Amino acid sequence: IPAAGSEGSSSCVISNDSIDAKFGVNSDLIRPKVSFLDPELTFTLPAYQTAAGVTDMIAHICERFFSGAGSSEVTDNIATGLIRALINQAPVAIAEPENYEARANIMWSGTLAHNDLAGCGLNAVPTSRAGGWESHALEHQLSAFDTSITHGAGLAVMMPAWMRFVWREDPSRFLAFADLVFGIEPVDETEEAVADAVTAAIDELQAFFAELGMPTKLGEFGLKLENVDAFLATLKANKGEAFGGFKLSLIHI
């Protein structure tokens, strides 16, 4: 499935079902020396998995875009161009599973989304990859707790929710996302106009996920409020009290 980006990334995830945990591992020792991509191998991929894969790709890009380390005009346009391409191509691939151009564009986007190209120049720490990876850390608690939850589907819920929670920490960055991806600009520079523009962009992203058949609420997984304490305990064990580029604190969740 094109999504994880394993054909070009330095990342992998290790799951331990006995303790309901998923851990991310990153090392250039994991990155393949060479890979060959054949879009025709994805023709039989079900619509749901195609949608979940596209959601994961967009999350890989957004994690880097919202790195908290400023901006780069070239990288920003690469990143948001990939998102726009995925928004355009995903519905085509779902409607026409054997559409070679759509499948090829999605597969190539998945590689570029996670081979670090979309984060060049956005590293807060030069020796680490760009981004705080907050949405991924949050989603890992869901799919570790319930292995029937597809990673991309979990991200469709967690990423927009995370964006709504933190955007005020860096409004200019979220305005850039709104403009470059959806062409949304605030009508003026007032706080209300900025909030409206950012919220509209997040709404558009969430609506796109829903259009693909992805969930938008935790309740769609059958999860309940009492499950949150277990998620937070695992998250604290893995990440500490605060983590990510926006320093998301567990006391605020």
What are these regions, as identified by a protein language model?
Residues 1-77, 81-82, 176-180:
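A glycine/threonine-rich phosphate-anchoring loop and its flanking beta-alpha core
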Residues 35, 251-253:
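Conserved small/polar residues in nucleotide/adenosyl-binding loops
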Residues 51-54, 103, 155, 228:
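Short runs of predominantly hydrophobic/aromatic residues within well-ordered alpha helices
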Residues 64-204:
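Active-site segments that bind and position negatively charged phosphate/pyrophosphate groups
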Residues 178-251:
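C-terminal charged capping/lid subdomain of soluble metabolic enzymes
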